[in-house]
Structure formats: C-alpha cells, structure tokens
Amino acid sequence: MAFDISVNASKTINALVYFSTQQNKLVIRNEVNDTHYTVEFDRDKVVDTFISYNRHNDSIEIRGVLPEETNIGCTVNTPVSMTYLYNKYSFKLILAEYIRHRNTVSGNIYSALMTLDDLVIKQYGDIDLLFNEKLKVDSDSGLFDFVNFVKDIICCDSRIVVALSSLVSKHWELTNKKYRCMALAEHIADSIPISELSRPRYNLCKYLRGHTESIEDEFDYFEDDDSSTCSVVTDRETDV
C-alpha cells in the first residue's frame, strides 16, 4: 500500500511512534495540517518512507509503502501528544511561528514555550509596565526600540528574547499593531545564533519528556552540531 503526502514547508509535521502492548501492533500517529492520521501494523513489518523537499512548490513530500494488512484511521482536530522531529533550522521556524501568532498557536511545543513567561517576569517584573513605560512599544518607533532592547540579550539567552518577543507580539495584536508581529518574528528568528538554540531545544526536550515542569530551568546541555535531528517522546500517551 503506497502513500504520498505533500505539506507546505512552513507547516510542522508531528508524529508519535510507539508499540501498543494492548493491540500488539506498532502505531504511528501523524498530524498534518490539523488532520490526524493513525496507522497500525504488526511490529515485524517494515515501513519504507522517503522524505524530500520540493523547492518548486516549497513543500515537504513524504512517500512510502505500508504493509498490506494496515489499519489507517483519520480524524480532524483531535488533540494528541506527539513526537516532534526538527533540526535547528526548522526550530527557528517554530520560534518564529510562536512569536508571530502567540494568541492562536496551540500544541505541546507552544505550551512549553509559554512557561518561559515566568522567567521573564522574574527578571523584569511587571511586563505591561516594561512595555508601556520603559520601552513604549506602542509608539511610532516601538518596534525599533524593542529590537534595540533585546539585541544584547539574544546572544546570551535566547529564551528571554523569545519570551519577550512573543509577549510583545501578543500585546500588539490586542492593540491593532498586528503588522509588526511578522516583521519582529522574522528578525528575531534570523538573529538568534544557531549555537544559542541548543539550550532552549534541550530544555524543551526535557520538559516534553516530563522531566521538568517548565523550560526555564538551567540544564547541562551539549552542542549537537553533528546531529541535525532532535526527537522528543511524550510518554504520557504511550504504553511503551
């Protein structure tokens, strides 16, 4: 049974793979464009897949062959915990999406990123006071002033910059300055050094594995330049 999935490259593809002891089957749960697919097959079967990027239409294409005896289910808008696979560059896209659409994003990664708000509050206190009185983010030069404020922080703690940027983006959406959100998101995502992404990605992995209640905590992490993939498994919905 062959399958062919094409999805816009700006979208995040979430997948959870686990073995179900109750059904004695290997289960793959995918989320593509708010549609959830469940695939079940015997654990001794082989699934062949090929993932490629089509630069002509800016899409990610997934092709593969499933065993003949495969159960496939499909539901729309059913919340499930997922395994998130991403490299450092696509993680920047995740951060940009979080900054750009703070008021509407949903899912495990974005919920985890929101715990960074506590880190910002501990450091700056009243965020509304910071935005309105000190930075005056609603002024004509508000976007420029905010970028100048975070430019010295971005190389030493990207977590604070991401949290502040998402909060000011949320503020602008509520004050009819939504047009600033996209510009800020693209600037921040481009400005964060690749080397600085290790800490938030590592802490995010720890959070999604249930090892900590927030991602503001400091951990001993390592640079993984030799690895382009980070895999996070949420054990809460598996019976492994």
UniProtKB/Swiss-Prot annotation:
What keyword terms does UniProt attach to this protein?
Early protein, Host-virus interaction, Inhibition of host innate immune response by virus, Inhibition of host IRF3 by virus, Inhibition of host NF-kappa-B by virus, Inhibition of host RLR pathway by virus, Viral immunoevasion
In the induction comment, the record states: Expressed in the early phase of the viral replicative cycle.
GO annotation terms (biological process): symbiont-mediated suppression of host cytoplasmic pattern recognition receptor signaling pathway via inhibition of IRF3 activity; symbiont-mediated suppression of host NF-kappaB cascade
Q: Which family does it belong to?
A: Belongs to the orthopoxvirus OPG176 family.
Function comment: BCL2-like protein which disrupts the host immune response by inhibiting the TLR4 signaling pathway leading to NF-kappa-B activation. Acts close to the plasma membrane and targets several host TIR-domain containing adapter proteins including MYD88, TIRAP, TRIF and TICAM2. In turn, blocks the host NF-kappa-B and TRIF-mediated IRF3 activation.
The annotated subunit structure for this chain is: Tetramer. Interacts with host MYD88, TRF4, TICAM2 and MAL.
The name of this protein is: Protein OPG176
Gene designation per UniProt: OPG176
